[in-house]
């Protein structure tokens, strides 16, 4: 058990603003016994006026020198709190249990993936891409389908059966009708949860329902594209009434699946089930047209797997080309976002001679004739 010295506090970074860090202190440091002498207390306050629940902190120079970054979600030790000014200094970053790069969050426990069953309609390919991206994080995935009041119970059952075959048990909710919001709250209790999903599905509205006093900006769905406008600009943790922290992330439509081709198959629960009872003939099988493959078959998302695999192979090839300057191929970008590999010309062989070099050559020739 860690022992903290006098003047040290433990907390969680809930927001990063330039070189400042908003730290939410643990509950036990806000007890009446931890107040300094002479500090006034209002009896009708739910918590003592001092110490504060949040401190705006800087990072110690020592941490900067050793390159220790501070992320949202980090558990940190705060020294020398200035209760009057609401300031402090981060002296230490405790070891991280998990770490996400995009969005940059530490110590997250699970991902709450929010989609809508209507307005915008549920797109299987887009949902599959988000699910694979969520699986790559190694966190637990909770699938939540909003706007369930817009479809019939029969349609809900069809969607549920389909997603069960994918390996996921969806939870149908409606923020507008307050359907199953309490069930979502149970999943989030005492955990750090990352909320993800495309724009326009009701993520911000759901967070507003879970934390009524947060008042996140809510974007309407664009009529032209049937997609929501981006309403979340940065990553921040918000405290839930029943314990736990919620991280809202910037909305985006198609996340990158940035895993290796060999790893991809393990991010499909259906494929994992097949590999649990059988093995492929080849250890490096990519489950396309190899003989005696245990994964290839008639499961619904197999076509999604092949498309994501092609993307992963193309990405890996591009990384290899960028890392090898002596490569004989180069990636050339075409119009409309398309790209292709072309033979690389020999360096300097086809370069036009500069005018300066031509003049110098003429001067040398003139001097030789003299």
UniProtKB/Swiss-Prot annotation:
It comes from the Bacteria. Its cofactor is Zn(2+). Keywords: Cytoplasm, GTP-binding, Hydrolase, Metal-binding, Nucleotide-binding, Ribosome biogenesis, RNA-binding, rRNA-binding, Zinc. GO terms for biological process: ribosomal small subunit biogenesis. GTP binds at residues 146-149, 197-205. Pfam families: RsgA_GTPase. GO terms for cellular component: cytoplasm. The keyword Disulfide bond does not apply. InterPro entries: G_CP_dom (IPR030378), NA-bd_OB-fold (IPR012340), P-loop_NTPase (IPR027417), Ribosome_biogen_GTPase_RsgA (IPR004881), RsgA_GTPase_dom (IPR010914). CDD domains: YjeQ_EngC (cd01854). Its EC number is 3.6.1.-. It is found in: Cytoplasm. SUPFAM superfamilies: Nucleic acid-binding proteins, P-loop containing nucleoside triphosphate hydrolases. Monomer. Associates with 30S ribosomal subunit, binds 16S rRNA. NCBIfam families: PRK12289.1, ribosome small subunit-dependent GTPase A. Belongs to the TRAFAC class YlqF/YawG GTPase family. RsgA subfamily. This is Small ribosomal subunit biogenesis GTPase RsgA. It comes from Trichormus variabilis (strain ATCC 29413 / PCC 7937). The lineage of its organism: Bacteria, Bacillati, Cyanobacteriota, Cyanophyceae, Nostocales. The gene is rsgA.
């Amino acid at each position: 058990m860690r022992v903290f010295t006098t003047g040290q506090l433990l907390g969680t970074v809930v927001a990063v603003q330039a070189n400042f860090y908003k730290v939410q202190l643990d509950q036990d440091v806000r007890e009446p016994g931890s107040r300094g002498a002479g500090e006034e207390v209002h009896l009708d306050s739910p918590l003592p006026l001092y110490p504060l629940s949040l401190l705006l902190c800087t990072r110690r120079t020592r941490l900067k020198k050793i390159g220790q970054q501070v992320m949202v979600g980090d558990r940190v030790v705060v020294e020398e709190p200035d209760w009057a000014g609401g300031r402090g200094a981060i002296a230490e970053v405790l070891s991280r249990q998990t770490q996400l790069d995009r969005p940059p969050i530490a110590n997250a426990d699970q991902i709450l993936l929010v989609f809508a069953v209507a307005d915008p309609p549920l797109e299987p390919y887009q949902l599959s891409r988000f699910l694979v991206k969520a699986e790559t994080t190694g966190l637990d995935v909770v699938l939540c389908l909003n706007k369930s009041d817009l479809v019939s119970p029969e349609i809900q059952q069809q969607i549920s059966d389909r997603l069960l075959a994918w390996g996921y048990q969806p939870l149908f909710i409606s923020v507008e009708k307050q359907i199953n919001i309490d069930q979502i709250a149970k999943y989030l209790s005492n955990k750090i949860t990352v909320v993800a999903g495309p724009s326009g599905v009701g993520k911000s509205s759901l967070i507003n329902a879970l934390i009524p006093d947060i008042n996140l900006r809510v974007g309407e769905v664009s009529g032209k594209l049937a997609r929501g406008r981006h309403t979340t600009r940065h990553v921040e943790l918000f405290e839930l009434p029943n314990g736990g922290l919620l991280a809202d992330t910037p909305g985006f439509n198609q996340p990158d699946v940035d895993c290796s081709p060999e790893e991809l198959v393990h991010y499909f629960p259906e494929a994992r089930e097949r590999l649990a009872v059988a093995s492929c003939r080849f250890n490096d099988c990519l489950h396309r047209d190899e003989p005696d493959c245990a994964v290839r078959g008639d499961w619904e998302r197999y076509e999604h797997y092949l498309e994501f695999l092609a993307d992963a192979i193309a990405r890996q090839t591009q990384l290899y080309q960028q890392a090898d300057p002596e490569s004989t191929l180069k990636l050339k970008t075409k119009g409309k976002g398309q790209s292709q590999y072309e033979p690389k010309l020999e360096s300097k062989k086809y370069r036009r001679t500069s005018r300066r070099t031509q003049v110098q050559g003429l001067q040398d020739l003139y001097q030789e004739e003299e």
